[in-house]
Curated annotation (Swiss-Prot):
CDD domains named in the record: CysRS_core
Name listed for the protein in its UniProt record: Cysteine--tRNA ligase
Keyword Phosphoprotein: no
Keywords annotated in UniProt: Aminoacyl-tRNA synthetase, ATP-binding, Cytoplasm, Ligase, Metal-binding, Nucleotide-binding, Protein biosynthesis, Zinc
Localisation per UniProt entry: Cytoplasm
Chain positions recorded as ATP binding sites: K268
Needed co-factor(s): Zn(2+)
Catalytic activity as recorded in UniProt: tRNA(Cys) + L-cysteine + ATP = L-cysteinyl-tRNA(Cys) + AMP + diphosphate
Natural source organism: Nanoarchaeum equitans (strain Kin4-M)
Pfam family for this entry, one: tRNA-synt_1e
GO molecular function: ATP binding; cysteine-tRNA ligase activity; zinc ion binding
Motif ('KMSKS' region): 265-269
Record note on cofactor: Binds 1 zinc ion per subunit.
Primary residence: cytoplasm
Length: 457
């Protein structure tokens, strides 16, 4: 059984979907005012990890992620660059899709965009107005937080804390902690003519409407960065539970730790933002997945040269063992029992248990490392077979080794020719063949009575 840490209850809980075997889940996506960065990658990859674990367990995931394609940040960027806001949005959404494809993130069920759901959002705002949960000000329509009794249940902020805002907005509200559902038309800003007037949606109502349109008025899992707990997710809950008359709106809230650069917060003001494509180009996509998933998802992830080098060492060791085990299994058969079999099975169970324990990837990696240590001491068929099975299930969940098509027959024939040259002691020619194969990504290991090859994936 899968256990997840639920921010809503502040504890680890057994995962039980509302409509088994289906799992409905929503991830807060990007606001495409700029290129996606490694922090966004981590959120997408943790979502991908959870979906692969659910599929491993036999569930059918229905996953949705959005694009907030109209927002204050987009308008500001458009003004700074003197560029149409729609162009900025389209460029940066394409950038996200390029990155997700490179990292082989599972496609989502739907990628809703705010501008495609303006009428849905306006209708939701009108419903809240009509039922007394919202009120009109001069600049916006606001949610009346005092009308919702459970405010603060997610963040633990019970004092109805306000956030930074301009004086004229404070004066426009009943209470400083009320938040905008709909922003009325302002000079020089995009707007839509709707049932609640000319304007555009507020930040929080967008996710409430889009998620429930595709997943229903109640669904299983909501994911996002830990920086969204307050006010975004707290406000989502308040408006959704009043809008749909449900409690709880979402059963499990999963929050992902922030990315740091050399121990410091990643931010534009510090100039240490790492763009997604830049990071993927420097380190191949498979390793990017491995590195960004190797720290427990709830903890901060620190990107530093030291941490990357440590991860590269582990990744290379695992990759070499995976390829060697694959080659042995493809080329040998044995019916011999080995005493290490039981130990490997224990470590395999430990690895799977770690994945199911709140996606504990560091422990899962450590368990696989224990299997590799046994295999490296005894690279024979029965151990190789079990090692390969462990790698295959690990990769079903982590997807950190992408398969590349290889013509096995041709490679095997070349290896046999090389072995013949070695038997005839034509070592110089045999070494030349080895070097040529290595340049093509085929690595060779010579043992006393056999040669094992594998693709350096």
């Amino acid at each position: 059984m899968l256990y997840l840490y639920n921010t809503l209850t502040s504890r680890k809980e057994a995962f039980i979907p509302l409509e088994e075997p289906f799992v409905k889940m929503y991830t807060c996506g990007v606001t495409p005012y700029d290129k996606a960065h490694v922090g966004h990658l981590r959120t997408y990859l943790v979502t991908d990890l959870l979906r692969r674990i659910l599929r491993f367990l036999g569930y059918y995931d229905i996953a949705v992620t959005n694009f907030t394609d109209i927002d204050d940040k987009i308008i500001k960027k458009s003004q700074e660059l003197n560029k149409d806001w729609k162009e900025i949005v389209e460029e940066n959404i394409k950038y996200v899709f390029d990155v997700l494809k490179e990292l082989k993130v599972l496609p989502f069920y739907v990628y809703p965009r705010v501008t495609y759901h303006i009428d849905d959002i306006a209708n939701a705002v009108k419903s809240l107005l009509d039922r007394g949960y919202a009120y009109k000000g001069k600049y916006s329509i606001y949610f009346d937080v005092d009308k919702y009794p459970y405010y603060g249940q997610l963040s633990g902020i019970k004092s109805k804390k306000e956030w930074e805002q301009e004086k004229h907005l404070l004066e426009d509200k009943k209470n400083p902690y009320d938040f905008a559902l709909w922003k009325f038309k302002q000079p020089g800003e995009p707007y839509w003519n709707t049932i609640v007037g000319e304007g555009r949606p507020g930040w929080h109502i967008e996710c409430s409407v889009m998620s429930s349109k595709y997943l229903g008025e109640r669904f299983d899992i909501h994911l996002g960065g830990s920086d969204l707990i307050f006010p975004h997710h707290e406000n989502e809950i308040a408006q959704s539970e009043t809008l749909y008359n449900v409690h709880p709106w979402v059963r499990y809230w999963v929050h992902i730790g922030m990315v740091q650069i050399n121990g410091e917060k990643m931010s534009k003001s510090l100039g240490n933002i790492i763009e997604a494509k830049e990071f993927i180009k420097k380190y191949k996509p498979e390793f990017v997945r491995f590195f960004l998933l190797s720290t427990h998802y709830r903890k901060p992830l620190d990107i530093s040269e030291e941490n990357i080098e440590q991860a590269q060492t582990i990744y290379k060791k695992l990759t070499d063992a995976y390829n060697t085990a694959k080659s042995i299994v493809e080329n040998e058969v044995s019916y011999r029992f080995d005493k290490d079999v039981r130990i490997i099975l224990d470590y395999y169970r430990e690895m799977i248990k770690a994945f199911l324990d709140d996606m504990n990837t560091p422990t899962a990696i450590a368990s696989l490392n224990k299997i590799v240590s046994i295999f490296n001491q005894n690279p024979e068929y029965p151990i190789a077979y079990l090692t390969l099975r462990a790698f295959e299930d690990f990769n079903r969940i982590m997807n950190v080794w992408f398969e590349k098509p290889i013509d096995l027959d041709i490679i095997n024939e070349i290896i046999e020719i090389r072995n013949m040259l070695r038997r005839e002691k034509q070592y110089e020619l045999a070494d030349k063949i080895r070097d040529i194969l290595q340049k093509k990504g085929i690595k060779i290991k010579d043992y006393k009575d056999k040669t094992v090859w594998y693709a350096d994936i």
